[in-house]
A protein has these predicted regions:
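Conserved Radical SAM active-site core
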Residues: 1-138, 146-149, 160-161, 165, ...
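Auxiliary Fe-S-binding modules of radical SAM enzymes
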Residues: 2-14, 192-302
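Hydrophobic faces of well-ordered beta-strands that scaffold small-molecule active sites
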Residues: 29, 82, 115, 139-141, ...
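Conserved radical SAM core fold
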Residues: 83-92, 122-125, 137-157, 186, ...
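Anion (oxyanion) recognition and catalysis
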Residues: 109, 171-172, 199, 259
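Conserved beta-strand termini and adjacent loop/short-helix elements that scaffold enzyme active sites
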Residues: 120, 142, 266-270
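Glycine-enriched alpha-helix->loop->beta-strand junction motifs that scaffold or abut catalytic
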Residues: 133-139, 199-204
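Conserved strand-turn element in the central/C-terminal portion of the radical SAM core barrel
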Residues: 156, 168-189, 240-244
């Protein structure tokens, strides 16, 4: 089937396996119920997927709805990390119609897998009933600003306030949550202000730098020149001259924040577990491509 719904080209496609071995530092498997993402984030690294899928359409204007063989032996993934939404958002607006992510979660019940859901949506609250049944599950929301105008310039996903409200609801349901401050835009993202808003409703507070490469580098640099001309010299230093001092200073700032609030400060994620409310683990995910290993066992290669 192929049709255009609200300006988005929708295709239904068959796939042999919904699981893909992951090369991410968190390891395990990438699980993407869709190809493409209609949030249309201007900085989305996943836009590179078009090279492999053959899509000619602009990123954010298409969505492939996957159909896969039912997972009949979920125990096969016991103890494995499953990242749902590594190159899509399983809770894109079209999930309300197609329900792929809910179907996936239903098939994973009893797996005893370590499941990480990455999203920018508040639709995840619909599935709290399933999340409770899955046991070791973590839900992560990307929040890199409290400014709705900047957010709207960057993506068409749920508002920041809706994401924060969803995080609170999921956290209070007893499910581990992450505030993923990603990407940190130099001179724009105020991660301390975000921390103040979410520290009582998240277990982990991840920090990741804005990494500009490929086609979206020009998009972002042009945006900065047009909206934040005073930041052009800083972006030139970081992204053309490869000066790392800005993010190195942010690492120091983040570690001091961790000390102030009595929070653990680590280079990578801690093993699954909850932490005392108000003391989330602060994860230094800057330049994460240098981290090898998982669960804070990896070392940085500088």
């Amino acid at each position: 089937m192929e049709e255009v719904i609200n300006g988005i080209l929708i295709r239904e496609v068959e796939t042999k396996n919904i699981m893909t071995k992951s090369s991410l530092p968190v390891g395990g498997y990438s699980v993407n119920p869709y190809v493409g993402c209609t949030h249309a984030c201007k900085y989305c690294y996943a836009s590179f997927m078009k090279r492999f899928t053959g899509h000619k359409e602009e990123w954010g204007t298409f969505l492939d709805v996957k159909h896969w063989p039912e997972i009949k032996n979920p125990k096969k993934y016991a103890g494995q990390r499953l990242v749902i939404g590594s190159v899509t958002d399983g809770y894109n607006p079209q999930e309300e119609q197609f329900g792929n992510t809910r179907k996936l979660l239903e098939q994973l019940i009893g797996s005893d897998a370590d499941i990480l859901i990455c999203t920018k949506s508040d639709l995840v609250v619909r599935d709290i009933d399933l999340l409770k049944k899955l046991g070791r599950v973590t839900v992560s929301w990307s929040i890199n600003t409290l400014d709705e105008n900047f957010k709207n310039d960057m993506d068409s996903a749920s508002s920041i306030e809706h994401r924060i409200a969803a995080m609170k609801q999921v956290y209070e349901a007893g499910i581990r949550t992450v505030c993923f401050v990603s990407p940190v835009f130099p001179g724009i993202t105020d991660f301390e202000a975000i921390f103040e808003r979410v520290k009582d409703q998240c277990d982990l507070f991840w920090l990741e730098n804005l990494n500009l490469r490929g086609g979206f580098k020009k998009t972002i640099m042009d945006y900065i020149a047009g909206k934040y001309p005073e930041l052009v010299p800083l972006y030139d230093e970081i992204y053309n001259k490869h000066n790392r001092s800005y993010f190195e200073a942010l690492e120091v700032k983040a570690e001091k924040m961790a000390q102030k609030y009595d929070c653990a400060f680590v280079d990578n994620e801690m093993p699954y577990g909850r932490v005392p409310q108000g003391h989330p683990v602060i994860v230094d995910y800057f330049y994460h491509e240098e981290i090898r290993g998982t669960e804070n066992t990896g070392k940085r290669n500088r």
